[in-house]
């Protein structure tokens, strides 16, 4: 498998843009990431290029997937458990009181014990003219040669390329005709537009025609641009993918370049019970494909539903970590087609880097009256239901959430010690999101938000020593330097308070936008196993060994 990972990494290398361990008997538990994005590679790449990223490039699911957060053991006696914890504190940037319930799914399953089935893998590659840049197509050839050599005998690989039109180079046949596939790899050339619709449809047709329940049936789509040829309507592309995914074929998407259609690629993956990745470096490629092949295709549970009902004294606010939450102010929930064991098992970046840590679901809570520091007692009830692969039996679990916060409590008050890392991750995300929002109208206010966030993160990490938070602070420094280069002067005093409090700040001659904040080139995020209701690939984390 290691050689296979290297082969796929080589295949895709040029599509890129330039606490202590604790023991737990009987296995551990962890968080779940809701949604398709598994990194914030585009956000990071824009910063590396000297730009100012827009809010849409900071995907909550991707951000959480790059943070390992400890969770309690999976001790409910089932393969899947729900854990609900709460924090009451103050926003790291604005200082407002806030209460949040964080939901995790945990499992005793060890990622090292997960074995993948043989592959029915259809690779759909963009060979448009832009693939000539930096000899990307040359590296694709080299990678294909390596991949062909390293696939296991039981695997099947089909190859489709698309530019203005579509070419089917090989089907899903067994045994693999390695000689013919090597000849095909030598012939790949780049030219023309980007006909994603026809290329993806042909990939699905091949996968559907050879569908086998004893195999992993998946299409892997790579593109470095937005649709420019054939049917370019995003709704049509998404609708076509939904039809094929309903037949049980998964879809993973890989986005490359700063100007690709992140929302379309992410939406396709989410509709396909798959992941969306952005490749910003050769290292990222190795991380992505190691995780995708080894962990992201064998579901632990199907038809997973998480529901939250607020106590009459509380109501639900913003939900961060899934785009598919349905509900009102008193109750809500999310349905997930499948959940998978995550690959990362500690806060140290491992074989797959910072990806693969899973994710989190945060539900903002507010008391009907008063402030969250005084609303003690019951807060919400949480219900989990799911079924195991190959079974129709529905397994259920219920847990209750309560607050014991008080005005004398330290900031933050945590319902469990294991909530600390989650709360810091949540606070960092909110702070970075606030900075991207401020940058839309004032670079100086964005800089002020980042300065405040960094001070809070520094204070927090003096005790926590979380390497993921250190990595976030490096992003803050890069973001801050880019703002300074674009004219953001030092901010302080009343002006800073006005910015952080959401006032009118300081737009005008002191703000230099140039090309403005970089955002997605289009819109939408979206997956299904067999069922397409609410689509999200979910990873389950384990406790540190």
Positions of the model-derived regions?
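Juxtamembrane/start-of-transmembrane alpha-helix segments at the extracytoplasmic/lumenal side
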Residues: 518-530
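Acidic, polar loop-rich interaction surfaces within structured domains
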Residues: 78, 212, 235-247, 256-389
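Sec-dependent signal peptide recognition
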Residues: 2-10, 527-532
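DG-centered beta-turn motif at the end of beta-strands
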Residues: 125-128, 140, 159-162, 203, ...
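A cross-kingdom C-terminal cell-surface attachment/processing module
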Residues: 528-543
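Von Willebrand factor
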Residues: 17-150, 158, 167-169, 173-215, 258-261, ...
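C-terminal motif of bacterial Sec signal peptides marking the signal peptidase cleavage site
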Residues: 13-16, 519
